[in-house]
């Protein structure tokens, strides 16, 4: 992610701004949890997610390319929905003595936490993985009735 180009314009000609671009990009990537781009290094990232609300449910769609159902975990604890995933890579060759010439794919993991709204039904949560997209469905329930205001008598001394 390179936000600094939008702030400073094209600064390729100025070494100060080039180094500043790198520093700003590192800071932004670290803050956002973006995986390093170096080939073969594992990283932690925020999986791109959409949260969609319908009249009957909330749906969370998370991109998890290269992951299957065994690679992701969805947990609920004290009203917080935790979604984690990890993609591991194994560099294998078909024949003994084979050699990996180039390795550009990276292993990575992600972890996100979401506080459920009070109208979420935690007992009906489902999760399914299809073509590298995790879909977590949280059905809605009627929110608890708000208590009527209670008037407290004020007495004099």
From Swiss-Prot:
Residue span, sHSP domain: 40-155
Q: What is its induction behaviour?
A: Regulated by light only upon heat shock.
Major subcellular location class: plastid
Q: Which UniProt keywords apply?
A: Chloroplast, Plastid, Stress response
Give an example GO cellular component term for this record: chloroplast
Superkingdom is Eukaryota
Q: Which SUPFAM superfamilies match?
A: HSP20-like chaperones
**Gene3D superfamilies per the UniProt record, alphabetical:** 2.60.40.790
Q: Where in the cell is it found?
A: Plastid, Chloroplast
Read off the PANTHER family from this record. HEAT-SHOCK PROTEIN 20 FAMILY MEMBER
Q: Which family does it belong to?
A: Belongs to the small heat shock protein (HSP20) family.
What's the protein called, per UniProt? Answer: Heat shock 22 kDa protein, chloroplastic
Q: Lineage of this protein's species?
A: Eukaryota, Viridiplantae, Chlorophyta, core chlorophytes, Chlorophyceae
